[in-house]
UniProtKB/Swiss-Prot annotation:
With S4 and S5 plays an important role in translational accuracy. SUPFAM superfamilies: Nucleic acid-binding proteins. CDD domains: Ribosomal_S12. Residues 106-135 are annotated as: Disordered. InterPro entries: NA-bd_OB-fold (IPR012340), Ribosomal_uS12 (IPR006032), Ribosomal_uS12_bac (IPR005679). NCBIfam families: rpsL_bact. Keywords: Methylation, Ribonucleoprotein, Ribosomal protein, RNA-binding, rRNA-binding, tRNA-binding. This is Small ribosomal subunit protein uS12. One of its GO terms (molecular function) is rRNA binding.
Length: 135
């Protein structure tokens, strides 16, 4: 604990907060162009092929972004929108691609949590896709 004299001599410094998504430069989203689309494996104890893309942003950064949802239409030179948000089991992946905007199509046949995957509301007259539903 500092003395009053020490506080007069040197005031308290506020802790500097470090951003978790520096490539966004304080913006909620950023546009970018995919330079490489590939799959990678998560760290232990998980096992899968996670879909990720290397994206060159308008802010000048090149980052690795996760492609959420089942299936995607992204390839090299696709224009995408990214947001912050890391993937816990993929080291170095601190951004998510926003589905349903620009060249990233929404997830097909998505019934629940549609807004997170850019899926439109299904028409009420269509046949139900979930055949395993019980009464």
């Amino acid at each position: 604990m500092p003395t009053i004299q020490q506080l007069i001599r040197e005031e308290r410094k506020a802790a500097v907060r470090k951003t978790k998504a520096p490539a966004l430069k304080g913006c909620p989203q950023r546009r970018g162009v995919c330079t490489r689309v590939y799959t990678t494996t998560p760290k232990k104890p998980n096992s899968a092929l996670r879909k990720v893309a290397r994206v060159r942003l308008t802010s000048g950064f090149e980052v690795t972004a996760y492609i959420p949802g089942i299936g995607h239409n992204l390839q090299e030179h696709s224009v995408v929108m990214i947001r912050g948000g890391r993937v816990k089991d993929l080291p170095g992946v601190r951004y998510h691609i926003i589905r349903g905007t620009l060249d990233a199509a929404g997830v097909k046949d998505r019934k629940q949590g549609r807004s997170k995957y850019g899926a439109k509301r299904p028409k009420p007259g269509q046949a139900p896709a979930a055949a395993g539903k019980k009464k």
